[in-house]
Structures are given as C-alpha cells and as structure tokens.
C-alpha cells in the first residue's frame, strides 16, 4: 500500500498529520511514480499562487486512476476555477485541474470547526478540524459532484456572528477535496478510508511505520534547512528547561509583523514555535512553511472570542514542550481594542515575555515611525511590559536611520532597522494573496539579528482585567509634567 504526499514549491506536507497515512514523497522529480500509488494526498499551501504544478505533473494527476484527496489549496487545485482576487476591483481567475466541478471565490475563515462528513468512503459523521483560507467560498456547479463536508463556523471575513453552516468539501468518483485541515486526523475518517481500501491491521501498522520515516525526511527538506544547511547539522536541543521568547507588537496593522516573524524564524538555531495572538492564523503559516512545523490549537492565543486557546493553556503547553524559541506575533496595533480589554498588550502582559515594538516607515516617514515607536515604548514600559527594543520596518533612508539609532543608543534603547522590499506585490501580502516560497525567501534575506532573551514561563495567570484608561491617564499626567 503506497499513499503519496505531494511535496512541491508552496505545499505544506507537515502542516498536519494527514492521519499518518503518507508513505511516499512525490516531488517534481519523481512525479511519474504517481501512477503506481493507491492514493495521492495534495496538502494545503499556496499551490495556486506559487504556480507550482507544471504541465507534466498536472497531466500525471489528471490521468491518475487511484484516489486523490486534496486539502485546502490541494482541494482548490482540483477545482475548475479559483478567483483569488480578494481586495481586487475585478476577479482574478486561475484555472484548476477540473477534476471536481467546483468554483472558488474569496471567503476568509480561520476558525476551529466541527464538520459533518456526508456518506462517502470516509463514512459519515461529525469530526473536528480547522479552516485557514482566504478564498474558500465554494460553488458546486454540476450534479455529478457531491458535497463531502459541511462545516459549522462562527467567523467569516473577520466578522463574528451566529454559527452557520458552509459547504467545505466535495467529491466526484475517486477525487475528494475539503477545506478542513485535520480532516484525515479524525480517526473514523482515516479508518473508514483504510477499510474501503481493504487494509488489514498489520498493513495499517506498516503504513504508520513508513509514515514516521517520511516525516523525518520531509522535515530535513524544510526551506529553512535548504537555505542554510548548517542549521540542520547544528539543530540539537541543549536544555529542555531553557527557553527564549519574544512578542512582536506593532504600532499599527500592516507594519510587517508576519514578515519579521518569518525572518526571525529562519535565523534561529534550534526548534522554533510560532504563535499568533487572536484567530487569524494565516499570519503564521509562512513561518510554519519555512520551518515545516505542524499547526496546532496552541499556535493561536485567544483574545476575547477570537483565537483557539487561552493564555494559561498556551503557557502550559510551551512549558512542557522541547522548543528552544517562542515567537509570538501580536494582532493589529498593540493597543487596538484596549478599552474593551482585548488588545495585544494585555495578552503580552499575561504572557510575561519581552516585547519588540515594530513600526513601519511607509506611512508617516522614518521620523514619524520612530516617534510613534517611542510613544509605544514609553507607555508599555509604564504599564509594566518588558520592552526589549524597537524595530523600524520598511526603512528607505539608512542615513536617517543611523542618526536615530545613535540617538536611541544614547538613551540605552535598542533600535534595529529592516529595509523596504523592492517589489511588494500581491504574492507577498498574507491577508490578500501569498506565495509562501517567495515570501519566505525574501524574509530569509533580511539582515536582522536581535537578542531573544531567556524567559521564565509562569502558567499561573491571574484572571484580572487591566484598566487601560487608568494606565493612559497616569501616563498622560507624566507627559503634562513637561
């Protein structure tokens, strides 16, 4: 029994376990072996945006007579058409393989979900998983294509509302697709599929053993190690009790937190865990792509009703883990929604990790970005946050930056600069359209080395609200003293 997993540019073959079913890695080099498989799993990623499937690979998949299971982007590639034109004045239509009579259009969903499997080779019943997509609105355009999964979601296009059901999967003949990540990790789904294939218990164990081997191989092929092979040789855990961590908080949205999270992840020698404050886990997928790490419920820290696990559960998980570094990415600006007690700074205070303030120079100029960062620096320190330093992103004038750096050093403030990307196209914008390979390669090329301090993890969190208005009042009193 051979079950292939497609490992090509833009794919996420370790984003989930896929039921521990894959036994063979399929790449651009051995794609002709697809015909010998019993089944092929096409994982999520940025397969559409990365233009990853060449004509020969497409032909091999179309002519394959075994079972095909596409997850998220792997499902989209099986469809007829995909409109990736989010925030575009006109649709941007990409052609799929046409194996499923389905069309996609923009719909953002990053929920953990309960889904229902309709009667199929996977059985029928309810399971759990998560959505992580930008264009997930599904229209089934032919009666021969049947609905495979329906998901219950509460948040669509960033808006929380009453729970509703959306079509999340479809199938036709031997071709199956779903937007639900962890679909195959539901035991009943996996076991019904294996039963349909006539797999015995002994064969099942053989599959699992093969899967362990290819997971190790897939990990070694992570982009991080391909870009810097030395890190693979040196990637040894020295002390399970010592962990280093930071939180990236910004002065506003679109400051480049995701880009910097990915850049930092590419440099560190050791196991890196990335997490997002709030529910938009799409922001950390580039780092997970680079690292070839799995998305778990602990990668999203709950803020209000958005996100997956609360702070104490996150810290408990981290404390018991064998990760060397923890990088937490904030949501929007550090103080956004602080009056409602659902801001990034309030989560940062509970986490107790040191903070770097990110301020982008493309809106109010390099001088304005520095002044904004200093205001955030001052207020966060007043509140009791450990502020480690400031990162000015999208720097366009290094002469001006160096003057500001000298000034910051005079006042014992660490200031770092990251240059502006030459061409920030749609494929480099996480919330719109992203090519993971290009995004991560750009991030790897960033010259950024910051100190990531050792952290003491205290998972006994006091459940108390921080009075932001009072904090602000005290801070403003100090301002008026001048």
Swiss-Prot record:
Residues 1-203 form the Glutamine amidotransferase type-1 domain. PROSITE patterns: GATASE_TYPE_1. GO terms for molecular function: glutaminase activity; transferase activity. Gene3D superfamilies: 3.40.50.880, P-loop containing nucleotide triphosphate hydrolases. Keywords: Glutamine amidotransferase, Transferase. Signal peptide: none annotated. NCBIfam families: PRK06278.1. It comes from Methanocaldococcus jannaschii (strain ATCC 43067 / DSM 2661 / JAL-1 / JCM 10045 / NBRC 100440) (Methanococcus jannaschii). GO terms for biological process: cobalamin biosynthetic process; pyridoxal phosphate biosynthetic process; pyridoxine metabolic process. This is Putative glutamine amidotransferase-like protein MJ0138. One of its GO terms (cellular component) is cytosol. InterPro entries: Class_I_gatase-like (IPR029062), CobQ/CobB/MinD/ParA_Nub-bd_dom (IPR002586), CobQ_GATase1 (IPR033949), GATase_3 (IPR011698), P-loop_NTPase (IPR027417), PdxT/SNO (IPR002161).
């Amino acid at each position: 029994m051979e079950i292939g997993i497609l490992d090509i540019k833009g794919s996420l073959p370790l984003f989930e376990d896929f039921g521990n079913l894959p036994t063979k890695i399929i790449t651009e080099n051995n794609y002709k072996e697809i015909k010998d498989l019993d089944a092929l799993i096409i994982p999520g990623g940025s397969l559409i945006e990365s233009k990853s499937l060449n004509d020969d690979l497409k032909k091999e998949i179309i002519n394959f007579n075994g079972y095909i299971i596409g997850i998220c982007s792997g499902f989209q590639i099986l469809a007829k058409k995909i409109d990736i034109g989010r925030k575009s004045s006109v649709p941007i239509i990409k052609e799929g393989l046409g194996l499923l009579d389905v069309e996609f259009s923009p719909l953002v969903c990053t929920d953990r979900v309960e889904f229902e499997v309709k009667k199929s080779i996977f059985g029928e019943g309810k399971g759990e998983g998560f959505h992580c997509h930008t264009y997930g609105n599904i229209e089934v355009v032919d009666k021969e294509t049947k609905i495979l999964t329906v998901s219950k979601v509460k948040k669509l296009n960033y808006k929380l509302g009453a729970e509703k059901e959306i079509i999340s999967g479809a199938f036709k003949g031997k071709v199956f697709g779903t937007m639900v990540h962890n679909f195959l990790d539901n035991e009943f789904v996996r076991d019904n599929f294996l039963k349909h294939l006539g797999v015995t218990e002994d064969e099942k164990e053989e599959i699992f053993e093969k899967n362990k081997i290819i997971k190790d191989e897939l990990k070694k092929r992570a982009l991080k190690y391909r870009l810097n092979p030395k890190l693979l040789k040196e990637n040894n855990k020295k002390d399970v009790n010592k962990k280093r961590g930071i939180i990236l908080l910004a002065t506003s949205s679109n400051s480049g937190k995701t880009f910097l999270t990915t850049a930092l992840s590419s440099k560190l020698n050791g196991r890196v865990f990335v997490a997002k404050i709030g529910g938009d886990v799409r922001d950390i997928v580039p780092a997970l792509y680079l690292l070839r790490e799995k998305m778990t419920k602990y990668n999203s820290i709950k803020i209000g009703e958005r996100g997956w696990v609360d702070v104490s559960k996150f810290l408990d998980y981290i404390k018991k883990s064998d990760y060397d570094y923890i990088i937490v990415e904030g949501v929007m600006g550090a103080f956004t929604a602080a009056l409602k007690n659902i801001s990034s700074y309030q989560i940062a205070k509970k986490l107790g990790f040191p903070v770097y303030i990110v301020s982008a120079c493309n809106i109010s100029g390099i001088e304005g970005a520095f002044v904004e960062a200093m205001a955030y620096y001052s207020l966060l320190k007043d509140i009791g946050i450990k502020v480690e330093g400031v990162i000015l992103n999208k720097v366009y004038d290094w002469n001006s930056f160096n003057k500001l750096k000298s000034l910051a050093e005079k006042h014992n403030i660490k200031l770092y600069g990251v240059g502006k990307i030459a061409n920030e196209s749609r494929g480099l914008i996480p919330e719109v359209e992203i090519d993971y390979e290009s995004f991560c390669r750009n991030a790897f090329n960033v010259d950024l080395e910051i100190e990531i301090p050792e952290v003491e993890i205290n998972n006994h969190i006091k459940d108390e609200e921080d009075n932001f208005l009072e904090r602000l009042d005290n801070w403003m009193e100090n301002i008026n003293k001048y």
